[in-house]
């Protein structure tokens, strides 16, 4: 008598005993809504008052483009956007949607700082941050 059918039955039973993965399923296909939200925020930032033409210094750029600081920087922008009543709530509503997409790695440095109630500083830095966020999401979206 062959043990082949018994082996199949044992494999089937073992397969049923494997614990299921917990958490959200990982999908490489991000909905287009996230890229649309980035564009909506950029449009709000480009409206009047016109954004400051003053360039960011190299340390600020590095801080905004650092992948390990994406989540801490998002927290800073969420907090700062609540201080700007006109567009702040709309920006905050869009930005908070990115929280579940960003990992919380050990940051390599301090998050960005934004001058208190300074719309121009907020605009300049958020535009560069959105560029980094878009790059991160595009990379994550590639198969």
UniProtKB/Swiss-Prot annotation:
Residues 1-23 form the signal peptide. Its main location: secreted. Glycans are attached at residue 79. It holds the Pfam family IL3. It is found in: Secreted. Keywords: Cytokine, Glycoprotein, Growth factor, Secreted, Signal. GO terms for cellular component: extracellular space. Granulocyte/macrophage colony-stimulating factors are cytokines that act in hematopoiesis by controlling the production, differentiation, and function of 2 related white cell populations of the blood, the granulocytes and the monocytes-macrophages. This CSF induces granulocytes, macrophages, mast cells, stem cells, erythroid cells, eosinophils and megakaryocytes. Monomer. This is Interleukin-3. The lineage of its organism: Eukaryota, Metazoa, Chordata, Craniata, Vertebrata.
């Amino acid at each position: 008598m062959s043990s082949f059918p018994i082996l199949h039955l044992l494999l089937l039973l073992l397969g049923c005993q494997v614990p299921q993965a917990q958490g959200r399923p990982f999908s490489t296909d991000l909905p287009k809504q996230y890229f649309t939200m980035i564009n909506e925020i950029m449009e709000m930032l480009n409206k009047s008052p016109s954004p400051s033409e003053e360039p960011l210094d190299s340390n600020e750029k590095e801080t905004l483009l650092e992948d390990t600081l994406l989540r801490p920087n998002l927290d800073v922008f969420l907090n700062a956007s609540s201080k700007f009543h006109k567009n702040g709530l709309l920006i905050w509503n869009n930005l908070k949607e990115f929280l579940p997409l960003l990992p919380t790695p050990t940051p390599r440095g301090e998050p960005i700082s934004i001058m208190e109630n300074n719309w121009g500083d907020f605009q300049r830095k958020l535009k560069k941050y959105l560029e980094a966020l878009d790059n991160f999401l595009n990379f994550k979206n590639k198969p």
